[in-house]
């Protein structure tokens, strides 16, 4: 398990010491992170090392995952997209399926922790069904710049019951009674995805795809859909070409 001291070469000793001091005030607390999957996607990738790191700092941290039917995950995928401005037909049946699955998960999960952090919209209504022993925080990982109004009107009724909301940027803040804080995500430099490649590994990949190395090289890695802004990547490439030929 990676210890916090091993991050010094990336963030500096002062930052690591500050993390230790902040963690000391939380030592002994029971914390639970709740999301919808153990693998796939950025949230799961973030929670895996974060849970281990928090435990190594003396914060008793668990990671709970809700379960659901294919219909549930189809609905929450559309909700996820609607929070980013996409269209959605939020029928009464869809709401019933969504809320029923979350209720069923509240029965299966004993969330009596001192702190609960719920990630993204999938587990959001859990707060309606669990006895609060301490603060609940909703961590929204999506772009809330211009959410679908119908979607936000529905979900905000749950959000308002939380003690705090964490969003990535100030531009994502919404009109809420609940306090909002802004916290940018980070990568784990020790994950397989982010590890440094050897020179032979790099050259092998470049040769395989026929990528020349006589010019500066920048990569953008994401799935190919509108929410990852592939058109923006092309525009960025054109701007870069104006500077580097």
Question: Which residues does each predicted region cover?
Answer:
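Catalytic cores of nucleotide-sugar-dependent glycosyltransferases that transfer UDP/GDP/TDP-activated
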Residues: 1-245
């Amino acid at each position: 398990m990676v210890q916090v001291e091993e991050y010094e070469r990336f963030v500096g000793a002062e930052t690591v010491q500050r993390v230790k001091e902040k963690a000391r005030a939380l030592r002994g607390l029971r914390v639970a992170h709740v999301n919808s999957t153990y693998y796939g996607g950025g949230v799961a990738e973030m929670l895996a090392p974060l849970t281990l790191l928090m435990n190594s700092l003396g914060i008793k941290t668990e990671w709970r995952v809700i379960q659901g039917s294919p219909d549930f995950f189809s609905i929450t995928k559309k909700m996820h997209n609607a929070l980013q401005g996409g269209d959605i037909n939020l029928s009464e049946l869809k709401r019933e399926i969504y809320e029923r699955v979350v209720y069923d998960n509240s029965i299966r999960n004993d969330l009596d922790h001192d702190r609960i952090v719920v990630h993204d919209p999938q587990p959001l209504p859990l707060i309606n069904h669990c006895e609060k022993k301490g603060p609940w925080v909703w961590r929204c990982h999506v772009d809330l710049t211009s959410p679908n109004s119908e979607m936000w009107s529905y979900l905000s009724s749950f959000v308002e019951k939380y003690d705090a909301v964490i969003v990535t940027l100030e531009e994502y803040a919404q009109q809420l009674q609940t306090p909002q804080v802004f916290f940018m995500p980070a990568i784990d430099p020790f994950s397989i995805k982010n590890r440094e490649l050897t020179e032979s590994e790099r050259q092998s990949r470049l040769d395989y795809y026929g990528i020349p190395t006589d010019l500066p090289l920048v990569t953008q890695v994401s799935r190919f859909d509108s929410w990852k802004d592939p058109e923006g990547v092309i525009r960025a490439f054109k701007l870069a070409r104006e500077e580097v030929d």
